[in-house]
Amino acid sequence: MSKQSPTRKLRQTVYDASLKVMFTLRPERIHGLMNKALGVVDGVAPLNRTMEKIIAVHDDSLSQEVFGVTFPRPLGLAAGFDKNASMADAWGAVGFGYAELGTVTASPQPGNPTPRLFRLPADKAILNRMGFNNLGAAEVATNLSNRKSTDVIGINIGKTKVVPAEHAVDDYRRSASLLGDLADYLVVNVSSPNTPGLRDLQAVESLRPILAAVQESTTVPVLVKIAPDLSDEDIDAVADLAVELKLAGIVATNTTISREGLNTPAGEVEAMGAGGISGAPVAARSLEVLKRLYARVGKEMVLISVGGISTPEQAWERITSGATLLQGYTPFIYGGPDWIRDIHLGIAKQLKAHGLRNIADAVGSELEWKN
């Protein structure tokens, strides 16, 4: 990356100092404070527009049409932050090209008992066992219907915890029916480790009727989100099913239940308990899964890569390895809006360095990063 400007350095210094203060608070308390701040951006249109002009990267080379939707920039907010679409109009203002909201379940639910969110600063990671806490599809639909912006929005839907697996199809269908027309795309989440039995629904025989029901319930593109902990054979099976059902794409990957290779002392991690880890520790496996998916089905559907994309170099590698779109959550917590800006500026610079007119030309190209 080019040398940082004094303004950029100042912004990052201020954010880093703020982060140190915030990290003295409980993680969910920080999340609540960030929600309130973003809620102001969401609700004040002039502020929203001003921030978008200042913070977001505006470069025609970053814009692309994906499954019939125009994405102005490739990096989006990953699901898990804006669970209730309460800040749906704020994400473009902080620089994202789109946002995936949720996870939303058909019925409201409180999620798992607290504490359920933990920081691993030594790993630039977060461990969570939130358990799909949300207001339910009907309430989220109301929030979405009150949106003022035309920013691209995806909705991530999951299974209500109390609904048994044998009734999962109807549960997902209900969410899709309520939310589908209010989103630009839907993602079927069967890969969170924090709802008992949910990951079992990734098995093809369980997944097929769920995906088919969601497709029947909406006219918007449908994608499926998978776990990094699937075996290579299971990844292939889900990919083949996605092609068979003509899904719009695959989001890869969710959080990992692996605890290997962490810098955080094992005793501290064990004390945190169960949950999925996001951020830097999942980066290598997420890249592996992306490459496997692209080799198998990349020419037939859109691949959205998420998991530990912390630097512009990593973002470029995901794109050149087959990702049409990118997502992040944990790096946003650690890096703030300038992380989003750096990613987009880095990608635009690489496109220019390689003589490419549009990001679509770089997808799957295997082009190296140019310094």
Curated annotation (Swiss-Prot):
Any single Pfam family the record assigns to this protein: DHO_dh
Q: Cite the binding residues for substrate.
A: 83, 128-132, 189, 194, 254-255
Q: Please give one Gene Ontology molecular function term for this protein.
A: dihydroorotate dehydrogenase (quinone) activity
Cofactor detail note: Binds 1 FMN per subunit.
Listed under GO cellular component are: cytoplasm; plasma membrane
Q: Where in the cell is it found?
A: Cell membrane
User: Where would you say this protein principally sits, based on its record?
Assistant: membrane
Catalyzed chemical reaction(s): (S)-dihydroorotate + a quinone = orotate + a quinol
Name of the protein described by the UniProt record: Dihydroorotate dehydrogenase (quinone)
Organism annotation = Corynebacterium glutamicum (strain R)
